[in-house]
Amino acid sequence: ALTVFLWTFAEREKIYDLFEQICGARFTTSYTRVGGVANDIDDHVLRQIRDYISKFPAELAKSEALIARNRIFIDRMAGVGYITQEQAIQLGLTGPCIRGSGIAHDLRKAQPYLFYDQIDFDIMTQNDGDCWARFKVRLEEMKECVRIIHQILDKLPEGPVMANDPHYVLPRKGEIYTRMEELINDFMLINFGTMPEPGETYTAIES
């Protein structure tokens, strides 16, 4: 009963190792910043990511083969937690939860952000609306994510990883000690934070 749990946790640890190499933290990554990301990714880490996703499908298939025929697991998932399409919409479900009820809604397609409009991928759905359907959606999405990651790595642009806007972005530490303007900008951002124009904005991302 613990075999799949241990196998999948081994994969989770490999992903956490990649997180750690990218930003220095395994779980509380804090990689994104206002205006960009904390630091660039070096070629060594990119090669490690490619190496990992080349091996991941085989590891996933191994776990799927073991659990997809497990009668106890299926009995505890199939026909349990049934959600109709109408209920899914009324409850405001997103991600695999709404797609497990047969609704092909994905913000990466419906309202593309970043450069998802340049990525070729399919929306995974199941029509049964139960826990088993949602599990199968998540399983298929992991397979589809391998395709997505390959494309993102191929399209990853070179250049700065942080915007150059003193109203929102902290100056580089080396400049604070040599330029008065940068020292003032650092002081204002640390003490008062960003001060956007009046108004509201909301941006949703896929769950």
Language-model regions, residue ranges each:
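Metal/cofactor-centered catalytic core regions of large enzymes
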Residues: A1-S207
